[in-house]
Amino acid sequence: MPRTEFPACLIRPREGFYTSEVQAPVGWPLRTFLPTGYEPNYPYPLVVFLHGHGGSDEQVLRLAPRLSRRNYVCISLRGPHAVGVRPDGRPAFSWGGDDSQVEDYVLRAIEDTRRRYHVHSERIYLAGFREGAGLAYRLGLLYPERFGGVASLNGALPRGGPLLRLPDVRRLRVLIGHGIANAVAPLSLARADFRLLYTAGLAVRMRTYPTNHRIHPEMLRDIDRWIMDRINEEV
């Protein structure tokens, strides 16, 4: 597998946002947020942000400092399908349907990040927003051995095909965060997802928020608490 070339500024990593590429098989963007006081000897949890329909990698990675400025290495990826422009005039993207190239892109991006930074192999979390939540679910349930958990924010499980690899998926932790006024993915869908995953034996937690399909600030705080609770349980 070809090795991704990183800019020289990453040789001595400092807090901030960085951009590189993943060859999967062409150059796809990989955006990275490094925490304050990044310590190369500490194995950081990795949070992988997957944007919603009409979003972008650049847009969603802005949320990383609001999740935590210290606790995580964060990356964000870009859906391969252009879907016009956002209200701010910047390009908008979508993940599209079931695409093995997208899966390869995400998995390669994680491996590239692990080669460059000190990431804990059992603390890799997928955080999907709206459409990106469906991709996060799909990856987490197909490859439960690769991930510590999946956070679905205002999204839903993919329908129309088997996903649960019992009993393997029972090791996967899931956090569902959903707006009570979400008309795009109704709250009833999230509740049905919760029941399905709980019945399958997964450690699933659900929170609701006074919002529609947009991200509520408390969602990010709950993701931080959810991940840190798990880390504290392991200590």
Q: Whereabouts are the PLM-identified features?
A:
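Cap/lid segment of the alpha/beta-hydrolase catalytic domain
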Residues: 79-101
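Short substrate-entry loop that stabilizes the transition state in hydrolases
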Residues: 38-44, 49-85
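Alpha/beta-hydrolase active-site loop
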Residues: 95-117
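A domain-start/cap signature at the N-terminus of enzymes
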Residues: 1-46, 55, 191-195, 204, ...
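Short, surface-exposed alpha-helical segments at coil->helix boundaries
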Residues: 61, 103, 107, 186-194
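The feature captures the conserved acid-bearing segment of alpha/beta-hydrolase catalytic domains
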Residues: 149, 155-232
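Primarily recognizes the serine-hydrolase "nucleophile elbow" in alpha/beta-hydrolase
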Residues: 122-170
